Design a protein with these regions (language model features):
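Positively charged, solvent-exposed patches that mediate nucleic-acid binding
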Residues: 1-148
Length: 148
């Protein structure tokens, strides 16, 4: 029993050692000597979404709509919205995961300091990862928030 407790304490210490706060939008893993890509936060609060909807500029394509507004931080905040019109919970969650993964893998191309909301349209329901990724990159280019 005592051995399990010590193991749990060691794991907690290791986790605390691995994750450090982001500096200038970067996230570090110190134990492996690797630098992970930029660190983004999520938009979760209703009033944060409302600020972006009211003050932000929007562009859309066949599959996605993107609202963007500058924030006063050194990292991006991403919010994803998938309406019930798109499909049942399995479909909505799949689209959310595709959008989040597309953003995560292309995150280094996006400029820092923006609140971004991505809304999935009904046409995105049956699309592949590559279609969603290209739609997201296209909208980033329209907003001029992607490095060339």
């Amino acid at each position: 029993m005592e051995e399990k407790y010590l193991l749990a304490e060691e794991l907690k210490e290791e986790r605390n050692y691995q994750r450090r706060p982001h500096i200038c939008g970067l996230f570090f893993f110190l134990n492996k000597g690797e630098i992970n890509m930029k660190y983004s936060e999520s938009l979760k609060k209703y009033h944060d979404f409302q600020k972006v909807y009211k003050a932000g500029k929007s562009y859309g394509n066949k599959y996605l709509v993107m609202y963007v507004v500058e924030n006063q931080k050194n990292c991006n905040r991403l919010g994803i919205s998938v309406s019930k019109k798109v499909g049942n919970s399995v479909v909505r969650h799949r689209l959310t995961r595709l959008i989040r993964e597309s953003y995560r893998l292309k995150e280094e191309k996006f400029q820092c300091g923006y609140d971004i909301i991505v809304i999935a349209r009904v046409g995105a329901k049956e699309k592949s990862y590559f279609d969603i990724e290209s739609a997201l990159i296209h909208l980033g280019h329209l907003h001029n928030i992607i490095y060339e």
